[in-house]
Regions:
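Aromatic-residue-lined binding/catalytic grooves and analogous aromatic/hydrophobic interfacial grooves
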Residues: 1-436, 454-456, 474-477, 529, ...
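C-terminal catalytic domain of Rieske-type non-heme iron oxygenases
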Residues: 349-350, 354, 492-496, 502, ...
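Alpha-helix capping and helix-loop boundary segments enriched in small/acidic/polar residues
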Residues: 360-364, 377, 432-443, 459-471, ...
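Well-ordered alpha-helical segments within folded domains of soluble proteins
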Residues: 368-378, 442-453, 520-530, 584-593, ...
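Extended amphipathic alpha-helical segments enriched in small hydrophobics
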Residues: 462, 466-483, 526, 630-646
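C-terminal structured "cap/appendage" subdomains that terminate the fold
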Residues: 672-750
Length: 755
């Protein structure tokens, strides 16, 4: 039951820092000796503003590409898509600022830095002779403010200041530090980033100005306050309480943040003053009550979990089951800290980014990454944390309808590889060569809906099904139906098709990323139509139910390669990378439940062969995805091997290049792509749940993929299908005690013990 991250030295980089958040504000806290740093984010601070994505020639380009693919002219089809069926790139998630607290101490005798994940409270304590400093920090969701309590002895001067890489100013007013600024209008005219003195483009024209932002810092203290320029100085204080609040002018994904932005001047001041009026003790209690009420809904523990080591040492030695408990709890902690009701969905880095030009813009990559962020959320019984994802899907659908009609010429909703806070749904690429491999992926909305489908199956909320899920699901189904191509045998498929980011080699040696159809697209179409049939029956929509069944029966079936694998494309091409990180052709195994060892044994065997050929290496999220897949194949030892690969210690800054084979975990337990990418943390938590309990309809599989190493343990509070919760306690890998706590709408269950 390891729920604390602890270190005996300050962080030297982001990958060693400890994270705080409330779904709106995020902080990476370094625990510095001389100078403490809080690297701050505000979840709505992005470049740019909403823009239309017109493409009057898109329909003709698509039709031409379809004809070329049908004739086997892959290279020509790819060029048509890149030149005639691509639009602007996504915008960028930005850092807000860094808050520095300088107490002038340069050495220490003792030091501890801990994050209590159960309470969401971070503590830093250190001494140097008779001098001591203690800092306690949290970010409150109920009060939308960061609070830092400093207790110190022997510190004559404490300085507090704010810096930002964005266009900004910091000034003082009464007893406050005030940060104001404007985000850049940040365009990718050729897919490249342009900077002037490290800053992206800014414009004087109001119509091209980006988001406004404001942050206010105020202190309570028992010393003397003065200002030295824009530096706050507090003399001879042994107790200081720092309050910080921030907001942007973001006013919705369809409104210009500068011309139609939300009011922030008074809003930030009001948030801050309400928090200060509440007082530190009341704020802390409200925060802990809120945070622990979410964190405590589920629990996971294993025997042989004792350890007195610091977190980075546990990770390096990897001898105790404590590490798996930490992995589970970190995923849960990050979910609660980054995704809360009324906020934004988690991006590639959750809500934590300190780079003005982050990897992949820290955007929403929706060919797996955003979806993986929310894989465990519903099973963890965190509907408050899942709400931003539902809102993301609903907002994306609004722009997705425009793209379906204007680019494809059909009614419905469609999205592609990337999105951002402005909910772009168009294929990006901006006519750049080689982008078709990933940018044309056009079944992402179907995958996004998988998470919403799981929410209904687990919560059994018919009103949610009727008012939210079913309308989106049927729109998605209608899109695919309208876009289906039919072959001479009557099989239906989407064409052209990608298998995200993967390529094969043409006979002339050219790598290419589109084919007549792909296993992944077919699987998503099947999953969407199968769910549409299931839910049409529940809601009594008989006409659509029968219609969807007819299309469902005709979707191109799986094919097996000559060496026994799931065929990824329309034929057996020479693969460019047989160990490619994406295993998209196994979508039917996970996240969908179309391929299972009990219902489709031959396909399960082919999926297993596919995974063996792909191998156990990859990026952090790739390894986590494969762990989920091996759990679905009831191979707990192989799933654990993948988790062990993900738990490989990665030394920060050792290799600043992007890696597609390394994976691993940074000292602060964040997933390493490398670089940092948060999805693997959630994928790992999901895999642990899948190893211990799986649902398929009313069949509940108990310990379906229990590894030998987890001889005894317990998992509690996991939400299962039909609106119920399950606790499982097992001893010596065999005996299992199971408790199911139903809600009002719970089902009858068939319990199947697999171990």
């Amino acid at each position: 039951m390891n729920k604390t991250l602890k270190f005996n030295a300050p962080a030297t980089c982001f990958e060693e820092s400890l994270l705080l958040g409330n779904g709106f504000l995020g902080a990476a806290v370094y625990g510095g000796i001389e100078v403490e740093r809080y690297s701050m984010n505000e979840a709505t601070l992005w470049t740019g503003f909403p823009k239309d994505a017109p493409n009057p020639d898109g329909k003709e380009a698509l039709k031409k590409a379809q004809g070329l693919i049908a004739d086997g002219k892959h290279t020509e089809a790819a060029e048509v898509l890149e030149q005639g069926f691509s639009g602007d790139f996504s915008q960028t998630y930005l850092p807000l600022c860094s808050i520095y607290i300088d107490c002038g101490i340069t050495e220490y005798d003792t030091y501890s830095r801990t994050l209590d994940m159960e309470k969401g409270v971070l503590k830093v304590n250190y001494t140097d002779g008779d001098t001591s400093v203690s800092r306690e920090s949290f970010i409150s969701n109920p009060h939308r403010v960061m609070v830092v309590k400093i207790k110190q002895t022997g510190v004559p001067l404490t300085q507090i200041y704010i810096k930002s890489e964005l266009y900004h100013c910091v000034f003082t007013h009464e007893d406050k530090l005030i940060l104001r600024g404007t985000a850049p209008y940040y365009d990718h005219p050729t897919g490249r980033r342009y900077f002037t003195n490290k800053h992206p483009f800014y414009y004087e024209d109001d119509a091209k100005k980006g988001m406004k932002y404001k942050g206010v810092l105020k202190v309570e203290h028992n010393g003397e306050l003065r200002f030295n320029g824009d530096i706050m100085e507090i003399l001879n204080a042994d107790e200081i309480t720092v309050y910080f609040a921030a907001k942007t002018s973001f006013n919705g994904f369809e409104k210009h943040p500068y011309l139609e932005g939300a009011e922030i001047e008074n809003a930030v001041d009001e948030i801050l003053q309400k928090a200060i009026n509440k007082g530190y003790n009341a704020l802390k209690k409200a925060h802990i009550d809120d945070f622990s009420s979410l964190f405590g809904r589920t629990d996971f523990s294993l025997r042989n979990n004792k350890t007195d080591l610091y977190t980075d040492k546990i990770l390096k030695e990897h001898k105790s089951n404590a590490l798996y408990e930490l992995l589970f709890n970190v995923g849960k902690y990050l979910t609660i800290s980054a995704s809360r009701e009324g906020g934004q969905a988690m991006n590639l880095q959750g809500i934590w980014n300190e780079h003005i030009a982050p990897p992949w813009n820290s955007n929403y990559t929706i060919n797996i990454n955003t979806e993986m962020n929310y894989m465990p959320t519903t099973a963890l019984n965190l509907p408050e944390c899942f709400e931003p994802y539902v809102k993301f899907a609903e907002e994306l659908a609004i722009n997705g309808r425009k793209i379906a009609e204007e680019w494809y010429g059909v009614k419905g909703v469609i999205s592609h590889h990337n999105s951002d806070i402005w909910r772009i749904a168009n294929p990006v690429g901006n006519k750049c060569k080689g982008t078709h491999v990933w940018s044309f992926y056009n079944t992402s909305f179907g995958w996004i809906l998988w998470g919403l489908v799981e929410k209904f199956r687990m919560e059994n909320d018919v009103e949610y099904l009727k008012n939210t899920l079913y309308p989106l699901l049927t729109e998605c189904a209608e899109t695919y139906i309208a876009l289906f191509t039919e072959d001479e045998k009557g099989n239906l498929y989407l064409s052209p098709a990608t298998s995200p980011e993967n390529q094969f080699i043409l006979e002339d040696g050219t790598p290419i990323g589109i084919a007549k159809y792909s296993a992944m697209n077919n699987a998503i179409c099947r999953d969407i139509l199968k769910s549409a049939v299931e839910f049409a029956e529940i809601l009594g929509d008989d006409a659509n139910c029968q219609r969807y069944k007819k299309y469902l029966e005709k979707i191109m079936p799986y094919e097996i390669t000559s060496d026994g694998r799931i065929l990824e494309w329309d034929k057996e091409y020479t693969e460019q990378d047989i160990h490619h990180r994406h295993v998209s052709h196994l979508y039917g195994l996970h996240p969908a439940r179309e391929i299972t060892p009990y219902s489709t044994p031959e396909l399960a065997k082919a999926a297993k062969t596919s995974l063996n050929v792909r191998g156990d290496e990859g990026t952090g999220w790739c390894i986590a995805w494969k762990a989920n897949m091996w759990a679905r194949l009831f191979d707990g030892n192989r799933a654990l091997k993948l988790l062990d690969n993900q738990l490989t210690f990665v030394k920060p800054n050792e290799n600043k290049n992007i890696s597609i084979l390394s994976g691993g975990t940074y000292p602060n337990m964040l997933c390493a792509h490398p670089p940092f990418q948060i999805d693997g943390n959630f994928g790992a938590t999901s895999a642990i749940i899948e190893m211990l309990v799986q649902c398929n309809g009313n069949d509940i599989y108990i310990l379906p993929a229990l590894p030998d190493k987890w001889e005894s343990g317990e998992i509690k509070g996991i939400r299962i299908n039909g609106g119920a919760f399950i606790d499982i306690k097992w001893e010596k890998g065999k005996k299992a005690d199971v408790k199911i706590t139903p809600e009002e709408k719970a089902h009858n269950y068939n319990l199947i013990f697999k171990h």
